[in-house]
Amino acid sequence: MNKKEIFQSVTSIEEQIAHLYKQLGELKSYLGELIEENHRLQVENDHLRRRLEQLSERKVEQGKKQTKAKLVDIGEGYDNLARLYQEGFHICNVHYGSLRTDGDCLFCLSFLNKK
């Protein structure tokens, strides 16, 4: 190998190193962007999880309140209507107070089964 070929080889290797260094810089920049995006997404994910937990807790509390309200709503009036129906009277808005002669009334039953 003569001096010219050695010099060309060194120049070629130097160009390759420069190209690889440029690629390494681009990869480093891209990696930094990915790390920043990952951190941002983790923060957002944590925020959304806390928000979801809060909403779930609210729904559970509302469900408990509604259950208590339903238990309070079904009280003496409902019992009186059920007793009247068992005694053979209509409790529906169509035939309220009249005597049931043909067995069960679907309107009355649907009214009693409302929750």
From Swiss-Prot:
Zn(2+) binds at residues 90, 92, 105, 108. The lineage of its organism: Bacteria, Bacillati, Bacillota, Bacilli, Bacillales. One of its GO terms (biological process) is DNA replication. The gene is yabA. It comes from Anoxybacillus flavithermus (strain DSM 21510 / WK1). Homotetramer. Interacts with both DnaA and DnaN, acting as a bridge between these two proteins. This is Replication initiation control protein YabA. Binds 1 zinc ion per subunit. It is found in: Cytoplasm, Nucleoid. The keyword Zinc applies. One of its GO terms (cellular component) is nucleoid. Its cofactor is Zn(2+). The keyword Cytoplasm applies. Belongs to the YabA family. Keywords: Cytoplasm, DNA replication, DNA replication inhibitor, Metal-binding, Zinc.
